[in-house]
UniProtKB/Swiss-Prot annotation:
InterPro entries: Ala_racemase, Ala_racemase/Decarboxylase_C, Ala_racemase_C, Ala_racemase_N, Ala_racemase_pyridoxalP-BS, PLP-binding_barrel
This protein's name: Alanine racemase 2
EC number: 5.1.1.1
Purpose of the protein: Catalyzes the interconversion of L-alanine and D-alanine. May also act on other amino acids.
Active site positions, chain numbering: K39, Y272
Binding residues annotated for substrate, in chain numbering: R139, M320
Keyword check for Transport: no
GO biological process annotation, one example: peptidoglycan biosynthetic process
Modified-residue entries (N6-(pyridoxal phosphate)lysine), positions: K39
Keywords per UniProt: Isomerase, Pyridoxal phosphate
Reaction(s) catalysed (UniProt annotation): L-alanine = D-alanine
Length: 394
């Protein structure tokens, strides 16, 4: 057993990742490929190991948010196509080509300048480009057919750029009202038809995120982008209630009790601000996790953890590196007891979705903000096979 200096860790069940991939694979058309989205350190799960496992079990391409995230994967020996979904400045064009990382782009001037940069550098690699079409997200992308045609012409005229994909992004595919999703789909298809009428052969076409892939598998086109669903989390309660695909959460967050005390003497205040006052003989346990680890300060006096299969409340304010929980009056607990912060223990569960609802946010934020300083234990075939951590362990 690995002994951590600071006993808090994340368990990532790669068997669950495999199940989720296969569940989506069965749900979408056979011809549609799967792009595994591993941005934000794999939504907090760890991008390298999730990417490797996804590629082993059905994904053919990867997506990230930045060139830097892509380079991390390349340095780990991953050779599959990697698409940067976000905007990339021209200063990173040369680097992207050198590392064979595909960029999303949508501006004629950007295309021309990128080509000039690579021409001056006599780049040995042509830079792959996916054109981003804005059909209703209002974030990035071309917005008119005429604009799209000019971008395509600039791209096809370039000697150092190559066109390998075109995509859009649905903004409300996770909601019960499907009006905008269908409108976006119609608009995107009309853009593609417009290009075809110009005699332009289309590269890989993709539009579905997890929500759209589940709710509208007929929109899957050449490829879908599987993000939150890869990790066993649903994009929304609505998508989960459709009961079309069964997903299994891959992440658990755990810790061991660092210290236990019975609050027999005054003052019985707990944590900053003295917002919690313990009862006589109340047992308070300290856990080595705080808001610097991604456990939100908004859970102060509100959150719960699992101890010996029972829910126990957070006592007082969440601090940067530690929280305190109440084991109750004359409660039982000892240093070294395992506590589950997100996940299951003896039939009880605190789900990421529950925590997200408590915080008035979404599950994406809860997992993606988990700090890199927390060790990740990767589980495969029911056993821990790798530990990824910046913290020394013996």
């Amino acid at each position: 057993m690995i002994k951590l200096c600071r006993e808090v860790w994340i368990e990532v069940n790669l068997d669950a990742v495999k199940k989720n991939l296969r569940a989506i694979r069965r749900h979408i058309p056979h011809k549609s490929k799967i792009m595994a989205v591993v941005k934000a350190n794999g939504y907090g799960h760890g991008s390298i190991e999730v990417a490797r496992h996804a590629l082993e079990h059905g994904a053919s391409e990867l997506a990230v948010a930045s060139v830097e995230e892509g380079i991390v994967l390349r340095k780990a020996g991953i050779t599959a196509p990697i698409l940067v979904l976000g905007f990339t400045s021209l200063s990173c064009v040369k680097k992207s080509a050198a590392w064979n990382i595909t960029l999303s782009a949508f501006q004629v001037d950007w295309m021309k300048e990128a080509n000039e940069i690579l021409e001056k550098e006599a780049s040995a690699n042509r830079l792959a480009i996916h054109i981003n079409v804005d059909t209703g997200m209002g974030r990035l992308g071309v917005r008119t057919k005429e604009e799209l045609l000019e971008v395509v012409k600039a791209l096809k005229a370039s000697k150092f750029l190559r066109w390998t994909g075109i995509f859009t992004h649905f903004s409300t595919a996770d909601e019960p009202d499907t009006t905008l999703t269908k409108l976006q789909h119609e608009k995107f298809i009309s853009f593609l038809s417009f290009l075809k009428k110009q005699g332009i052969e289309l590269p890989t076409v993709h539009m579905c995120n997890t929500a759209a892939a589940i709710a509208f598998p007929e929109f899957s086109a050449d490829m879908i982008r599987l993000g939150i669903g890869l990790y066993g989390l649903y994009p929304s309660a609505y998508i989960k209630q459709l009961n079309l695909v069964k997903l299994e959460p891959a992440l658990s967050l755990k810790a061991r009790i660092a210290y236990v005390k019975t609050m027999r003497t005054e003052p019985r205040t707990v944590s900053y601000g003295a917002t919690y006052i313990a009862e006589p003989n109340e047992v308070i346990a300290t856990l080595p996790i705080g808001y610097a680890d991604g456990y939100s300060r908004a859970l102060s006096n509100r959150g719960f953890v699992l101890h010996r299969g029972k829910r126990v409340p957070v006592a007082g304010r969440v601090t940067m590196d530690m929280i305190m929980v109440s084991l109750g009056e004359n409660g039982e607990g000892k240093q070294g007891d395992e506590v589950v912060i997100y996940g299951k223990q003896k039939g009880a569960e605190i789900s990421v979705d529950e925590v997200a609802e408590m915080l008035n946010t979404i599950n994406y934020e809860v997992v993606s903000t988990l700090s890199r300083r927390i060790p990740r234990f990767y589980i495969r075939d029911g056993e821990i096979f790798k530990v990824s951590t910046p913290v020394l362990y013996v």
